[in-house]
């Protein structure tokens, strides 16, 4: 019903006369209040618009032919505005009709195409009914027109509409509403507007047709429905998780054993058990075990701030907490007397198997007992704990399974966070209907969802529109059914999936047990806001301020849910329960048939309207509750926590906003700086609250810092405001309420920087010379600083205007990967040199700018140049290489040396059973054009020399040979057989080290390649290039060649330089206590072989990350320092001392020098070096965290010039140094996610990676020769994924698990130590 006047005249309008049942009353009422009859009509139309748009301000366009516009040509359209205050009566409004605060009109517009009207309507007034005939052109162009002849003899009222825009049934309904509004105006001029009800008999008939049947209640226990499936499908897979699979029978036995254990500690019905788990099969065992023991479960997010976790425990009085080994440390920090139990394999290994023991039925447990509790945010700062009963959950999963076609063949993705009620629907809809719950790891959930969906064979998923938009149908070919829920679906997402899957759009607040409304046939033809019909519930639309008043069909009102799936209420909170859960049925319910027993109603606070076919159209929220990225957020809770940090408390508001330059919604906190409120009649822009006062800016920034520090401890990350916006006043509506719409509109008109006052008008901000001098202290002034600020902005993804001369690169979020980007941007775009060491040693922009030097031109290398610097000729080199590779000399493209690590890896695979070969297996989508796919692969094969590289031995050393050849495909008939044979094929000198295969049925692509041929960045380049060529996306010019890279390294055959030897002797100089061994001497072996593995996810809190940035430290530094502390704590020292020296190996990216394009080098640049760190006693408890991590980072920076010296050459320096290497038993690898290195490499490929070079942890022994490897992949989500492989002859499983537990604890200990430490003076801005 949005307004506009369309120029189209293709569709003739339709007309409907509206009878005036009381025509004489019109004149009498007009005379009584001294207004024209037309004013009464306009008031009635305003009441109709108010009903449809739930606004106190109604607008429409008016053409008044009764006065000066007798020409009937170029008729001006005037915008009428009518303010309708609920507390006023119809008579009062007519009496004050000429008061501008009640009724006013904007100046007439000559151009009728730009009429600013609401509801797309034009009201035409005339004294002569004949004049209406000249208005046919208007009837052809406006959506609808109300024509009114005020003739005293025979008043005439007519509705015209365009049927291509307005449905005839809706038009007829509008005509009836207008007729009813006029009758109400005539007969009840003295009643308040709030009591006017336009609901008609026709509306009642339609609602009776849609809601005649009360939903069937399923009066059972949830676990009884699960037990039905155990009996029917005992060997079917119930849960397929990243950490294990269980059948229905196995899940039955595990949950029974847990239930029996819980019953032994006196768990009773209505007792609440808190669950604190990462994504895991054991979380499902815990949920089901609690239910079968008779209790109710409550999920707690292990990543949320401790204060919020504690509030949930306190609110629910949970006296038992079930957790995992990974979350045990989190639970131990709770200030609670609750008993905590770790649920994992160890628990069931220690407990007897009760498979033959019947589970005792809990006393008095019935369908009306609590099944689970879910907490949502609350406006008082405390979470609201919703109590959902068994009957509600059973009714809900039964209705959902039918609506979503869930059955024994369904493999349902469990994506939603456990604290989100959708997870309960995922799990129990599946387990009560014989389906399989598919659970990715937390890392897969955020970093590789496509891969997880394909690896788990998911065919059904429920996702938010945002997440679903990240996927494409081509990439998840097995996904057959997709449900969008948790937030309003976007049209773009529906268009993406429409016709590709069975698409559904659902709605449901947590108080109504997951989903209660569903659009079963979502498609591009149906508006995204159409959420369908109720399931397991009846739906009603009531007046937003009075639930005893039904709204007419098509009018916007509050959505009211009725049925057995409505929750019991809020735990121990009668006041808030009474406010939204109705104790009594509304008075109108009896008119729709016999009252159902124990019916429940929930006032959702959501605005919606009925379409003419009975489906619901979602319109938004009526209060301060919003949804962001699927999370339900009470804005009042955020406002409350901000207020706790402010003294005195200024007027403030938090709103979900979009800015002019950022289209993704985010939370904005509006804080009044001058302190005040103002009435907003014209909805003008909100004035910025700081203006030219630079002192005010400084104080405001201090306030924001204080707020952030406070809410970081009390609110989860998804509730953190993304913007803090200073304003002079908050706008109010005429009713005195905060006008949130004005705040939202204000943000859409300005950029993010302008809103936060960091982007100001320079002429306005700098008020006088003194102020200019103050600004100049931080202002970027010289060309070097300007150049560097531009490079920083690019490397960090910031606006240049937000960077000043005293900013710290690390404090702005820079890390080693960002530093590498900066080095290469400097060389490529500015032709200046900058090293990673420069960046870490001088992180402040002004200091860093002084280190910039002009870049010397990189000399391009001729083929074979690196091999002909001695006595050998090109002919000799080419001939020898051709002979070794069994090729023609013309096929030899280039020959150059290896990196130290390449030679190390290749020689290891030649002399041992470690092949160093990785296999990437891709499942091909049916939609893929195989010919085009193979052409793309062949093109990439020719583009990247590393794919055409072989190794040969020349003069006692290995060198690499680039050959000219086309891609040769293998076509195996069996994937499994090929993988087995290929993995056993040993690499050899002179032979290809990449193998390409496509199964004969075209379903799988297998790329095998030696680890000496790639690193993470190279692999990303290859994958991205294949995708780009397939999609006809132009590739960027080739980056620096591998030969040019090698030319920048020292001669790897020559001894180390004196400078390098001095560095390594000093760095590795052992002390008496040096011993990084964590294994007994009897367990040490010469050539360890890792054959076992484990993995886990470690998350940093936003406070820990902020502390790192404030101290100018990187996450990689924390990871390295914590590992050193862990080794020190576990090592077997020869004697007691106050400190320990630890040493371990590590892999570095090897791209930390100023060679233009090195960040895009498509070749392995990794380097292998030892790391030695001295650990003092204070380092182990976090008391000297900053000092320790500063040493670790300084040592890493100092090592940069020498990191390519190579482990073998370092080992050969002297006997004392060689002895150090005998103590190295562990390898730490830190893998940053290569964001920003190439946009192409992040693009999804049509297919799914089944397995790849990032093999399972236990299989990583094929790629290294350490007894223990710890690989930490840094994640954009502020944490890292740890994979460990180990030789079980050197390390026991319990020992490794203990080591990892200690490592995780140490990471948080050091990070928390930083939070309690002052920022060093060198980092103050």
From Swiss-Prot:
Q: Does the keyword rRNA-binding apply?
A: no
Region (Adenylation) residue ranges read: 248-644
- Locate the O-(pantetheine 4'-phosphoryl)serine modifications and list their residues: 816
Annotated Carrier domain ranges read 779-856
Q: What's a BP term from Gene Ontology annotated to this protein?
A: secondary metabolite biosynthetic process
The GO cellular component terms are: cytoplasm
One Pfam family it belongs to: Condensation
- Identify the pathway: Antifungal biosynthesis
Positions of the UniProt region annotated as Condensation: 893-1310
Q: What is its EC number?
A: 6.3.2.-
Q: Which cofactor does it need?
A: pantetheine 4'-phosphate
Superkingdom per UniProt: Eukaryota
Molecular function GO labels: ligase activity; phosphopantetheine binding
Q: Which UniProt keywords apply?
A: Ligase, Phosphopantetheine, Phosphoprotein
The record's function comment reads: Nonribosomal peptide synthetase; part of the gene cluster that mediates the biosynthesis of the tetrahydropyranyl antifungal agent lanomycin that acts as an inhibitor of CYP51 and blocks the ergosterol biosynthesis.
According to the UniProt entry, the note on domains is: NRP synthetases are composed of discrete domains (adenylation (A), thiolation (T) or peptidyl carrier protein (PCP) and condensation (C) domains) which when grouped together are referred to as a single module. Each module is responsible for the recognition (via the A domain) and incorporation of a single amino acid into the growing peptide product. Thus, an NRP synthetase is generally composed of one or more modules and can terminate in a thioesterase domain (TE) that releases the newly synthesized peptide from the enzyme.
The family assignment reads: Belongs to the NRP synthetase family.
This protein is called: Nonribosomal peptide synthetase
Query: Origin organism of this chain?
Result: Pyrenophora dematioidea
């Amino acid at each position: 019903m949005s307004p506009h006047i369309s120029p189209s005249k293709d569709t003739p309008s339709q007309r409907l006369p509206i009878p005036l049942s009381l025509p004489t009353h019109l004149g009498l009422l007009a005379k009584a209040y001294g207004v024209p009859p037309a004013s009464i009509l306009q008031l009635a139309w305003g009441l109709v618009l108010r009903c449809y748009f739930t606004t106190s301000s109604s607008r429409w366009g008016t053409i008044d032919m009764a006065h000066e516009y007798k020409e009937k040509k170029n008729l001006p359209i005037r915008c009428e505005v009518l303010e309708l205050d609920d507390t006023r009566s119809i008579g009062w409004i007519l009496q004050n009709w000429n008061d501008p605060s009640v009724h006013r009109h904007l100046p007439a517009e000559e151009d009728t195409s730009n009429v600013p009207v609401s509801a797309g309507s034009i009201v035409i007034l005339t004294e002569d009914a004949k004049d209406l005939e000249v208005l046919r052109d208007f009837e052809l162009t406006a959506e609808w027109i109300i024509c009114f002849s005020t003739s005293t003899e025979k008043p005439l009222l007519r509705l015209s509409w365009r049927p291509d825009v307005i449905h005839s049934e809706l038009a007829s309904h509008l005509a009836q509403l207008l007729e009813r509004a006029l009758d109400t105006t005539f007969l009840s001029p003295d009643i308040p507007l709030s009591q006017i009800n336009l609901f008609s008999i026709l509306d009642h008939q339609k609602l009776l047709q849609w809601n005649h049947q009360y939903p069937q209640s399923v009066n059972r226990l949830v676990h009884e429905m699960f037990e039905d499936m155990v009996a029917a499908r005992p060997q079917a897979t119930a849960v397929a998780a990243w950490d294990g699979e269980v059948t229905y029978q196995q899940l039955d036995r595990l949950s029974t054993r847990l239930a029996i254990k819980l019953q032994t500690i006196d768990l009773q019905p209505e007792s609440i058990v808190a669950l604190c788990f990462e994504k895991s099969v054991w979380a499902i065992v815990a949920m089901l075990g609690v239910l079968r023991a008779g209790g109710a479960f409550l999920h707690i997010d292990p990543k949320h701030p401790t204060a919020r976790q504690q509030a949930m425990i306190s609110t629910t009085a949970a006296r038992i907490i079930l957790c995992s080994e990974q979350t045990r440390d989190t639970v131990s920090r709770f200030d609670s007397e609750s008993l905590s139990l770790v649920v994992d394999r160890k628990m069931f290994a220690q407990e007897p198997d009760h498979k033959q023991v019947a589970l005792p039925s809990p006393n008095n447990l019935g369908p009306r007992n609590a099944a689970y509790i879910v907490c949502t945010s609350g406006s008082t700062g405390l979470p609201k704990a919703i109590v959902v009963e068994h009957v509600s959950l059973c009714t809900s999963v039964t209705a959902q399974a039918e609506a979503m076609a869930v059955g024994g063949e369904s493999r349902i993705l469990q994506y939603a966070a456990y604290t989100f009620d959708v997870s309960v629907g995922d799990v129990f809809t599946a387990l009560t209907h014989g389906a399989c719950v598919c659970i990715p790891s937390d890392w897969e959930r955020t970093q590789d969802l496509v891969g997880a969906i394909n690896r788990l064979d998911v065919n059904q998923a429920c996702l938010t529109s945002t997440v679903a938009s990240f996927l494409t149908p081509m990439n998840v070919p097995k996904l057959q059914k997709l449900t969008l829920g948790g937030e309003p679906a976007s049209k773009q997402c529906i268009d993406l999936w429409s016709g590709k899957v069975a698409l559904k759009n659902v709605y449901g607040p947590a108080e109504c047990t997951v989903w209660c409304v569903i659009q079963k046939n979502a498609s591009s033809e149906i508006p995204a806001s159409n959420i369908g019909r109720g399931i397991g519930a009846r739906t009603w639309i009531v007046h937003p301020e009075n639930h005893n008043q039904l709204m007419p069909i098509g009018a916007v009102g509050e959505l009211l849910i009725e049925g057995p799936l409505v929750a019991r209420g809020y735990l121990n909170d009668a006041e808030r329960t009474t406010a939204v859960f109705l104790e009594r049925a509304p008075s109108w319910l009896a008119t729709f048939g016999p009252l159902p027993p124990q019916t429940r109603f929930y006032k959702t606070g959501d605005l919606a309207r009925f379409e003419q076919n009975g489906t619901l159209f979602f319109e938004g929220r009526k209060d301060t509750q919003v949804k962001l990225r699927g999370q339900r957020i009470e804005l009042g809770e955020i406002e409350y926590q901000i207020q706790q940090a402010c003294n005195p408390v200024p007027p403030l508001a938090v709103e979900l906003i979009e800015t002019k330059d950022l289209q993704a919604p985010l939370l904005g906190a509006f804080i009044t700086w001058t302190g005040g409120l103002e009435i907003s009649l014209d909805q003008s822009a909100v004035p910025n609250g700081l203006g030219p006062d630079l002192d005010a800016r400084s104080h405001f920034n201090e306030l924001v810092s204080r707020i952030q520090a406070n809410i970081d401890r009390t609110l989860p990350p998804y509730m953190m405001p993304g913007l803090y916006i200073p304003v002079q006043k908050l706008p109010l509506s005429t009713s005195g309420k905060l006008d949130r719409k004005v705040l939202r509109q204000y943000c859409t008109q300005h950029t993010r920087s302008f809103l936060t006052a960091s982007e100001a008008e320079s002429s306005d901000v700098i008020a006088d010379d003194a102020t200019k001098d103050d600004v100049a202290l931080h202002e970027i002034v010289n060309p070097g600083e300007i150049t560097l600020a531009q490079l920083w902005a690019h490397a960090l993804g910031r606006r240049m205007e937000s960077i000043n001369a005293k900013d710290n690169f690390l404090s702005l979020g820079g890390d080693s990967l960002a530093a590498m980007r900066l080095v290469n941007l400097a060389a490529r775009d500015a032709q200046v040199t900058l090293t990673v060491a420069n960046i870490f040693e001088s992180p402040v922009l002004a200091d860093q700018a002084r280190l910039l030097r002009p870049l010397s031109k990189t000399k391009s290398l001729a083929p074979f140049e690196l091999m002909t610097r001695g006595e050998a000729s090109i002919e000799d080199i080419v001939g020898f290489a051709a002979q070794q590779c069994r090729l023609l000399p013309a096929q030899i493209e280039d020959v150059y040396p290896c990196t130290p690590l390449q030679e190390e890896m290749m020689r290891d695979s030649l002399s041992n059973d470690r092949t160093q070969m990785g296999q990437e297996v891709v499942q091909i989508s049916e939609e893929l054009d195989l010919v085009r796919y193979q052409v793309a692969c062949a093109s990439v094969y020719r583009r990247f020399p590393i794919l055409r590289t072989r190794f040969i031995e020349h003069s006692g050393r290995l060198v690499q040979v680039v050959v000219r050849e086309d891609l040769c495909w293998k076509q195996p008939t069996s994937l499994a057989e090929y993988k087995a044979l290929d993995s056993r094929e040993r690499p050899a000198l002179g032979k290809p080290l990449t193998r390409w295969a496509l199964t004969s049925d075209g379903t799988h692509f297998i790329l095998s390649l030696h680890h000496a041929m790639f690193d993470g960045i190279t692999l990303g380049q290859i994958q991205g290039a294949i995708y780009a060529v397939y999609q006809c996306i132009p590739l960027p010019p080739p980056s620096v060649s591998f030969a040019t890279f090698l030319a920048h390294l020292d001669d790897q055959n020559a001894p180390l330089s004196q400078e390098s030897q001095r560095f390594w002797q000093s760095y590795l100089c052992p002390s008496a206590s040096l011993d990084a061994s964590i294994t007994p001497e009897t367990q040490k072996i010469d050539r360890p072989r890792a054959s076992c593995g484990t993995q886990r996810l470690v998350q940093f809190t936003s406070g820990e990350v902020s502390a790192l940035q404030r101290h100018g430290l990187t996450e990689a530094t924390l990871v390295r320092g914590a590992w050193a502390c862990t080794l020190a704590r576990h090592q077997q020292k020869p004697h007691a001392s106050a400190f320990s020296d630890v040493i371990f190996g590590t892999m570095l990216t090897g791209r930390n020098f100023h060679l233009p394009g090195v960040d895009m080098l498509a070749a392995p640049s990794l380097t292998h070096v030892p790391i030695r760190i001295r650990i003092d006693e204070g380092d182990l408890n976090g008391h000297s965290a900053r000092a320790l991590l500063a040493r670790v980072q300084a040592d890493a920076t100092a090592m940069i010039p020498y990191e390519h010296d190579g482990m073998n050459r370092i080992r050969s320096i002297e006997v004392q140094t060689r002895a150090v290497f005998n103590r190295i038993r562990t390898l730490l690898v830190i893998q940053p996610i290569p964001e920003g290195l190439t946009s192409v490499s992040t693009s999804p490929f049509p297919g799914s990676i089944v397995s790849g070079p990032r093999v399972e942890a236990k299989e990583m022994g094929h790629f290294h020769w350490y007894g223990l490897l710890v690989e930490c992949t840094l994640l954009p989500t502020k944490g890292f994924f740890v994979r460990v492989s180990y030789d079980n002859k050197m390390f026991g499983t319990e020992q490794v698990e203990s080591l990892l537990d200690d490592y995780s604890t140490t990471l948080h200990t050091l990070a928390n130590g930083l939070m309690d430490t002052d920022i060093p003076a060198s980092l103050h801005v």
